[in-house]
From Swiss-Prot:
Matching Pfam families: Aminotran_1_2 (PF00155)
Keyword Cytoplasm: yes
GO molecular function, one term: L-aspartate:2-oxoglutarate aminotransferase activity
InterPro entries the record matches: Aminotransferase_I/II_large (IPR004839), AspAT/PAT-like (IPR050596), NHTrfase_class1_PyrdxlP-BS (IPR004838), PyrdxlP-dep_Trfase (IPR015424), PyrdxlP-dep_Trfase_major (IPR015421), PyrdxlP-dep_Trfase_small (IPR015422)
Catalytic reactions on record: L-aspartate + 2-oxoglutarate = oxaloacetate + L-glutamate; L-arogenate + 2-oxoglutarate = prephenate + L-glutamate
Subunit structure comment from the entry: Homodimer.
Function: Catalyzes the reversible conversion of aspartate and 2-oxoglutarate to glutamate and oxaloacetate. Can also transaminate prephenate in the presence of glutamate.
Protein name listed in UniProt: Probable aspartate/prephenate aminotransferase
One annotated Gene Ontology cellular component of this protein: cytoplasm
Keyword Cytoplasm: yes
Primary subcellular site in the record, as a coarse category: cytoplasm
Species lineage: Bacteria, Pseudomonadati, Pseudomonadota, Alphaproteobacteria, Hyphomicrobiales
Positions that bind L-aspartate: 39, 125, 175, 375
Length: 400
């Protein structure tokens, strides 16, 4: 009898976590490494949010909470959806989890049966397909190519939907590409979904507040209100509020789904950390002034990285609308010989050789389901980004 579960054979470790770990190991050995693999802001959590957590500790808010979250936070979430997205949810239609990952996992665990399909646009966040596999679902990938700025086309979505499709995962702005959908681009997709009433929509809006220029964020139910009864809208405080370590994600959706997710979570972690929940109340209800300030910094970094990467031999880097990632193509380097003498045959080879040669850690695009590309997180200092891009330029120039 095998000791480990068969389900583990269907999943693989997170490539983004692996890259960050490799960078840390090399740094520990004395290597000069610039890590551009981590998907978290380099800003500190705002002081008013930290103070709310300290105040909660001093008030004794250190006990178990309701499984789906404290009422104060769930009411703040409902108010956020009304204020920012024009969506009406009662607080009972919301749920709080230990990060967005738990929200997604609970939704799949509560709904997927063997044979149920989940349509996942590629490139995708590395955890989507692994969660689906762990929960017994079947992954169905549909490519959103660089030709279309990594945005899924309606005709391709239509082809990907079958009678067995239970969920469609939508992520805008995207991790890993930074691509974000306009109202009209999203309307083309929701029109397809309206023709397929068996398909539920799981929208990951974690990067909602990180869009640049005059881009206006929209979420699926805003664009097509008739999807309200079969959409789970997920968000969190990690990215916009620089609270990745606080581990608070949340969602709103149909009450029967929220209750099912509550049941799963009740046998799993129960409520998220009480202190972090009180901090999240302040994040959602308190001042939002730092968000545009941080966005301006991110936008400047984006422009710097895109400009410098497009000067590197063999690299083509589109300009993303949001998040804090770029997803350049390294197709022009495939078949070239790296300074080590190794022939670069895949984007994974490119990333490995770049790390060994120049000490720059990025994530290979094949980990996200579409290559030959690589993902850079520009959530680090401008000085670090400039140096990393110079090293990438040097490495690409040395490939023959």
């Amino acid at each position: 009898m095998a000791f480990l579960a068969d389900a583990l054979s269907r999943v693989k470790p997170s490539a983004t976590i692996a890259v960050s770990q490799k960078a840390r190991e090399l740094k520990a050995k004395g290597r000069d490494v610039i890590g551009l693999g981590a998907g978290e802001p380099d800003f500190d959590t705002p002081d008013n949010i930290k103070k709310a957590a300290i105040d909660a500790i001093n008030r004794g808010e250190t006990k178990y909470t309701p499984v789906s979250g404290i009422p104060e936070l769930r009411k703040a979430i409902a108010a956020k959806f009304k204020r920012e997205n024009g969506l009406d949810y009662s607080w009972e239609q919301t749920i709080v989890g230990t990060g967005g990952k738990q929200i997604l996992f609970n939704a799949f665990m509560a709904t997927l049966n063997p044979g149920d399909e989940v349509s996942i646009p590629a490139p995708y966040w590395v955890s989507y397909p692994e969660m689906v596999a762990l929960c017994g679902g079947t992954r169905f990938f549909v490519s959103a190519t660089q030709e279309h700025n990594f945005k899924l086309q309606a005709a391709d979505l239509e082809k990907a939907i079958t009678p067995k499709t239970k969920w469609f995962i939508f992520n805008s702005p995207s991790n890993p590409t930074g691509a974000a959908y306009t109202h009209d681009e999203l309307k083309a997709l929701t029109d397809v979904l309206m023709k397929n009433p068996q398909v539920w929509v799981l929208t990951d809006d974690m990067y909602e507040h990180l869009t640049y220029g005059d881009f206006k964020f929209v979420t699926p139910v805003e664009v097509e209100p008739q999807l309200y009864d079969r959409t789970l809208t997920m968000n969190g405080v990690s990215k916009a509020y620089a609270m990745t370590g606080w581990r608070i994600g949340y969602a709103a959706g149909p009450i029967q789904l929220i209750k099912a997710m509550d049941m799963i979570q009740g046998q799993q972690t129960s409520g998220a950390t009480s202190i972090a929940q009180w901090a999240a109340v302040e994040a959602l209800n308190g001042t939002q002034d730092f968000i545009p300030e941080n966005k301006k910094i991110f936008e400047g970094r984006r422009d710097l990285v895109v400009s410098m990467l497009n000067q590197a031999k063999g690299i083509v880097c589109p300009v993303p609308e949001g998040a804090f990632y770029v997803y350049p193509s390294c197709k022009g380097l495939i078949g070239k010989t790296a300074p080590s003498g190794k022939v670069i045959e895949t984007d994974e080879d490119f990333v490995s050789e770049l790390l060994e040669s120049e000490g720059v850690a990025v994530v290979h695009g094949s980990a996200f389901g579409l290559g030959p590309n690589f993902r850079i997180s520009y959530a680090t200092s401008e000085e670090q980004l400039e140096e990393a891009c110079r090293r990438i330029q040097r490495f690409c120039g040395a490939c023959k």
